[in-house]
């Protein structure tokens, strides 16, 4: 491989290539995939002069390290973490010029879960269905990165831009998830619906890019049995037989047979990407009509 590229020297727990995903293919059984914390992904790209659609690296908890073949501007956003270039401290949430052959390391997250690493030109792997995103459910796109993997970089799009927003540090002490009830809320008793709105839930360690699983009280069902498989949207709150809701994230299955008690609007999903296991979760019912004027979650 010739031209600009990076080599993964430390892949971390889970590092994947992500962009804005591949929407519009659910009828083929293909989920959207893409960056779970889209605002952080977009900001990282902006800081290095890329469009928001350029591919970045999404790290999970332990970060990653890369060696660049040619001098490259890199930015790390999302979950705050220590950033170094050849062992010397570098800023997080700002463009960093990395000399040819140098190693930039994004260390373990100090708050939150997922960091985003953008390079000038974006990750240039081959698109699949119009996207470079790794889809861990269907297996589309690049595999999760391993030590020694070499990734091409695209041509620069323009000079790095000044940041006009402070990188979001992730959720606070509680993850607040507004949801619109339905379409299968009638499958649950009034007590089950109250439990969802008032119960004390926490993020489960079994959560992943497919869904945020919860620990806490079980939601009481009014009906037995299961549904025929039906379409599952991004943000669906599906309730499996154990009664504990699962929030479907970007690699979710496009169909399922467990009832969906509500749907979390997409604009509220980014904080879920940064919620570490054990984070308290509060579900807040809201009306379907009319956009929210203010989001405090």
Features from the language model and the residues they span:
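Conserved "landmark" site that anchors the functional core of diverse proteins
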Residues: 1-297
């Amino acid at each position: 491989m010739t031209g600009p590229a990076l080599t993964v020297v430390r892949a971390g727990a889970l590092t994947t290539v992500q962009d804005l995903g591949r929407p519009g293919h659910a009828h083929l059984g293909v989920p959207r995939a893409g960056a779970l914390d889209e605002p952080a992904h977009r900001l990282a790209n902006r800081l290095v002069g890329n469009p928001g659609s350029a591919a970045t690296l999404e790290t999970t908890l332990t970060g990653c390290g890369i060696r660049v073949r040619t001098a490259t501007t890199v930015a790390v956003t999302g979950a705050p973490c220590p950033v170094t270039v050849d062992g010397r401290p570098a800023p997080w949430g700002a463009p960093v010029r990395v000399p040819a052959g140098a190693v930039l390391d994004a260390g373990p997250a100090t708050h939150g879960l997922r960091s985003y690493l953008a390079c000038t030109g974006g990750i240039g792997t081959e698109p699949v269905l119009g996207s470079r995103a790794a889809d861990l459910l269907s297996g589309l796109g690049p595999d999760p990165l391993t030590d020694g993997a070499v990734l091409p970089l695209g041509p620069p799009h323009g000079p790095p831009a000044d940041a006009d927003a402070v990188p979001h540090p992730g959720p606070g002490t509680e993850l607040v998830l507004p949801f619109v009830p339905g379409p299968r809320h009638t499958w649950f008793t009034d007590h089950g619906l109250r439990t969802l709105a008032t119960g004390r839930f926490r993020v489960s360690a079994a959560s992943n890019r497919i869904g945020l699983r919860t620990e806490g009280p079980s939601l009481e069902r009014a009906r037995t049995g299961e549904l025929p498989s039906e379409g599952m949207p991004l943000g669906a709150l599906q309730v499996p037989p154990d009664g504990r809701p699962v929030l479907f994230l970007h690699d979710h299955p496009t169909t399922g047979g467990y009832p969906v008690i509500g749907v979390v609007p997409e604009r509220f999903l980014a904080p879920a990407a940064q919620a570490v296991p054990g984070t308290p979760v509060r579900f807040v019912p809201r009306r379907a009509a009319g956009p929210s004027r203010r989001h405090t979650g």
